[in-house]
Amino acid sequence: MSLVVMATGGTGGHIYPAVATARELNARGHETLLLGQRGGMEERVAAEQGLSFEGVDAGKLARSGQGRPDPRELFRAVRGVVEARRVLQARRPALVVGYGGFASLPGVLAAQSLGIATVLHEQNARLGLTQRVAVGRARAVGTAYEQVLGLPAGEGTLVGMPVREERLSREEAQRRLGLHSGPLTVFVMGGSQGSLFLNNSVPDTLRNILGKEGLLSGLGSEAGQIDLDFTHPRAGGAAVQVLHSTGPRWLADVAPRVHDLEWYHAVGYVDTVAAWAAADLAITRAGTGTLAEAAFHGVPLVMVPLPESSENHQYHNALSVQQAGAGRVVEQKNVQEALGAAVLECAEPGTRMAMRDAALARAQIGAAARFADLIEQHLPRS
């Protein structure tokens, strides 16, 4: 069988689709290798998932100052291409798959310079900068959306957003995470790297609406699978616990602010399969990967889109989830006034169950398999 290289990295939105597709290709007998930034998140994820990894240098193509490229980043990008060429010449893959983001660029450009076939996956509704650089010489582009701005009509193949299609029982997931099995579980995540804004705003909002005891007043034990031990006998409120993935660099800032709340669990990094399986409700940004994982696990969302996302794509992502009945959108500028009310609305049992069904209906089951099919179509015939 063939060796397929996954050029990926930077954020979970680029990395986890590569992991899901690599696993699918492995199951079909192919060998896979993740190629990304040396020392990046992708190196850690590959080790955790038992996948082979090679690291190279990588430079962000962001612009600084008066629209001039940062020469240091350009140098790193060029050096990364040189290093990636060495890796590909040594490993001789049949095909390289690019998942977008600056960390994928060295591998994709190196492959194209060596005449190795490339296939791309675009996770957003707008073709990213790295993909725009590479798309002209790519054999095919798999997409998560029917229409992708910047990609000529008919040049993309809708495959969906590959996610790790693994499910745990709620009880097993909560056991692994050290959570109680009774309370309503709220998962807070600002993407794979965390979100400074959510880290600053969510703890105070949840403290305000849940109080020191962590209770949703007025919902009672019907709000979730509540053990009597977690229902306050006087307030009659439903017990809540929070799992907040802050991102490693911000844990030290968030943890002291919630240390007095027994129901609030701040962690730097969490296994997202377990976290989604444990969650009854989540407060998140609106990256495509996050929304796809929530849909697969049937988790209702309160979404705070990143306003700086290109073409405001996170807002439009979130709006599509809300229109499908699977969540609520709270714009960042309105968080102080609206976030608490949105959480209370989505925690109401009838609303939450309806949103869960709507989320499951949005799930693009089998995306990794469909993308693997597309990749196999472009493997050289032996």
Swiss-Prot record:
Keyword flag Hydrolase = no
Q: Which domain of life is it from?
A: Bacteria
The main enzyme category here is: transferase
* Membrane topology classification: Peripheral membrane protein
Any GO molecular function:
undecaprenyldiphospho-muramoylpentapeptide beta-N-acetylglucosaminyltransferase activity
Keyword annotations for this protein, in alphabetical order, are: Cell cycle, Cell division, Cell membrane, Cell shape, Cell wall biogenesis/degradation, Glycosyltransferase, Membrane, Peptidoglycan synthesis, Transferase
GO biological processes: carbohydrate metabolic process; cell division; cell wall organization; lipid glycosylation; peptidoglycan biosynthetic process; regulation of cell shape
Annotated GO CC locations: plasma membrane
| Residues reported to bind UDP-N-acetyl-alpha-D-glucosamine | 11-13, 124, 164, 192, 314
As recorded in UniProt, its EC number(s) are 2.4.1.227
Matching Pfam families: Glyco_tran_28_C, Glyco_transf_28
What chemistry does it catalyse, as a reaction equation? di-trans,octa-cis-undecaprenyl diphospho-N-acetyl-alpha-D-muramoyl-L-alanyl-D-glutamyl-meso-2,6-diaminopimeloyl-D-alanyl-D-alanine + UDP-N-acetyl-alpha-D-glucosamine = di-trans,octa-cis-undecaprenyl diphospho-[N-acetyl-alpha-D-glucosaminyl-(1->4)]-N-acetyl-alpha-D-muramoyl-L-alanyl-D-glutamyl-meso-2,6-diaminopimeloyl-D-alanyl-D-alanine + UDP + H(+)
Family of this protein: Belongs to the glycosyltransferase 28 family. MurG subfamily.
Q: By what name is this protein known? A: UDP-N-acetylglucosamine--N-acetylmuramyl-(pentapeptide) pyrophosphoryl-undecaprenol N-acetylglucosamine transferase
